Every structure is written in C-alpha cells, then in structure tokens.
Design a protein with these regions (language model features):
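Glycine/serine-rich phosphate-binding loop and adjoining beta1-alpha1 elements at the start
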Residues: 34-168
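N-terminal cap/recognition module
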Residues: 1-31
Length: 169
C-alpha cells in the first residue's frame, strides 16, 4: 500500500514463496508503520528461489535492477529472510544506481530538496554500516557488529522480552 507518498518492507527469498505470503507480509508492514511510524504504507519484495543456489547473486542483481525506479522514488527495502542487508541489499542496489535501499521512502515521504537528499542519504549510508567500536554499545567489539546488526538485534530481543512478559518463562 502506498501511504504518505511511500511504502517500505524488506526483500526475502525462499524456495516456494508465493504471492499470498508476500501480500500478508506487506499488510503486516502496513500495520507496523501505522503503529510505529513513519506514516507510510507497507510493502514486501518476495523472490521464489532457493537461496542456496549459486545463482542467488545474479537473481538479486536482476531483481534490484528491475525495481530500482521504485527504490529511487517511493519504495524502501532492506534485508529479510535469506537476504542480507549489509552484504547483499546495500551493495547490489547501489550497483543499480540507488544511493541507499531506503532512498525511495525518504524521497516519496519527505519530498526533500536535492541537497537535503544528498546529505541525509549520505548520513544513512555511513550510519547503518558503521562498525561499533565502543564497548558501551556493543556486546563484543571484537566481532565488529554494525549499527544495522544492533538495530535488528534490539528488535529481536525486545520481542523475546515481550513474549516472556506475556507468557512467563
């Protein structure tokens, strides 16, 4: 769904993935953004392909090249099941001319000036791949976790905490 000029949701890949699963996930993203913001629509990219197949990279390159006009203007994506944001989504979308996989959300929802877009997307590009070096913000600085790793990990850990608050354990 397109809302507030944009929509967001990750890109997943698995053998047997079908349209109904992708639509359901997109609806879930719509609810997520309605509750937590920003006020945008929900989306999801789904690729019915075995992620263990050695042709995976080529499939992702063709997919992101095909959707790059959307990613430049109103769709934002990231990693999801079997698709890594740092090692696959960011570099492959960049090869397709997309500054960052969230460029479309920023462009469509905020309608920035070109200068503001360059500045903000530049900050985003540097921020999510930044390796956390401060022991106060990383469980293990030797493992070289990125900001993106910690954001994902925080969401997972909060979900687990919530489950235990509801059901004990």
């Amino acid at each position: 769904s397109l809302r507030g000029g944009a929509a967001g949701g990750g890109t997943r890949m698995r053998k047997g993935l079908d349209k109904n699963e992708v639509l359901s996930l997109a609806k879930t993203m719509e609810v997520k953004f309605t509750v937590s913001g920003p006020a945008i629509g929900g989306a999801k990219s789904g690729i019915n392909f075995d992620p263990k197949d050695p042709r995976k990279e080529g499939v992702l390159k063709r997919w992101f090249a095909a959707v790059s006009p959307l990613l430049k203007n109103y769709y934002g994506t990231g990693g999801d099941l079997n698709v890594d944001e740092i090692h696959e989504v960011i570099p492959i979308t960049e090869e397709s001319g997309v500054w960052h996989p969230q460029e479309g959300v920023f462009t469509g929802h905020f309608t920035p000036t070109e200068a503001d877009k360059i500045n903000r997307i530049g900050q985003l590009r540097q921020g999510v791949v930044k390796i956390i070096e401060n022991v106060n913000f990383s469980p293990d600085v030797v493992r070289k976790y990125t900001v993106a790793d910690m954001i994902t990990g925080y969401g997972v850990s909060e979900s687990i905490n919530h489950y235990y608050r509801l059901y004990g354990g």
